[in-house]
């Protein structure tokens, strides 16, 4: 257990993401408004690309191209990982783009997804109107389904999308029962099912989904993190098993959060 894991939430909020390498000693990280980054040698550039490709530790501080992240977004991702208990996180330009990169990373033609009823309407439409034409089958489930969710899981089920409270009805599912039932059924079928969870309402200070067996926590940071209705932001907290797929999904779709640097000005 490192020093930060022992901190109470209020103390952790002060210290999270304060990596000195991002700020060159400045108390607050200066805004990095850059697209192109210079390297002294080709070898240095190739080393950074290698770290990105293999997702080694140095990827978090590898500033190679603005769309792929900057010290501003790296610090935010690091802070959010500390708050959620995640392996690593990915920052995006909105809550909806965070949902998109998280779910599309694990779905393909023929995949089956279970989505909670009463979910955020644009999220529901992502499944039905965007992913549907690509051959993804979506089935909506009651937030109170409990153990009966196992009856709906088939070999093609690749992802479960949950919210608590539900955006439209404020229903709160029994997360522990759902996770246990999903894991038991997937083990029985010999398949892998990714469980995603939109935690925008509670946030990591009041509920930590990854501690309850969730694979991916999604947050519309436009709400509490930004807090002033003057910018948009999304965050995806990942387990070690899911991070690489989500990071690639973000990179390959051209989604970034580089307005973070501009927001400082």
Residue ranges and their predicted role:
Residues 9, 28, 60-63, 219-220, ...:
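Residue-level signal for pocket-adjacent positions within structured domains
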């Amino acid at each position: 257990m490192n020093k930060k894991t022992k901190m109470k939430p209020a103390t952790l909020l002060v210290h999270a993401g304060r990596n000195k390498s991002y700020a060159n000693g400045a108390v607050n990280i200066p805004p990095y408004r850059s697209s192109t980054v210079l390297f002294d040698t080709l070898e240095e550039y190739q080393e950074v690309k290698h770290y990105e490709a293999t997702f080694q530790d140095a990827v978090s501080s590898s500033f190679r191209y603005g769309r792929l992240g900057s010290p501003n977004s790296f610090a935010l991702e690091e802070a959010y990982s500390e708050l959620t208990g995640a392996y690593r996180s990915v920052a995006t330009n909105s809550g909806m783009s965070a949902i998109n990169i998280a779910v599309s990373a694990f779905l393909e033609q023929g995949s089956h997804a279970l989505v909670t009823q009463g979910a955020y309407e644009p999220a529901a439409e992502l499944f039905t109107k965007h992913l549907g034409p690509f051959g993804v089958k979506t089935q909506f489930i009651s937030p109170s389904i409990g153990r009966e969710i196992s009856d709906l899981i088939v070999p093609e089920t690749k992802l479960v999308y949950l919210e608590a409270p539900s955006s439209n009805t404020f229903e709160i599912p029994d997360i522990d029962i759902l996770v246990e039932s999903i894991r038991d059924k997937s083990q029985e079928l010999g398949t892998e099912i990714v469980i995603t969870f939109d935690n925008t309402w509670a946030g990591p200070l009041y509920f930590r989904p990854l501690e309850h067996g969730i694979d991916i926590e999604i947050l519309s940071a436009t709400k509490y993190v930004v807090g002033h209705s003057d910018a948009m932001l999304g965050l995806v907290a990942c387990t070690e098993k899911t991070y690489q797929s989500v990071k690639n999904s973000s990179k390959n779709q051209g989604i970034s959060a580089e307005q973070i640097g501009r927001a400082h000005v």
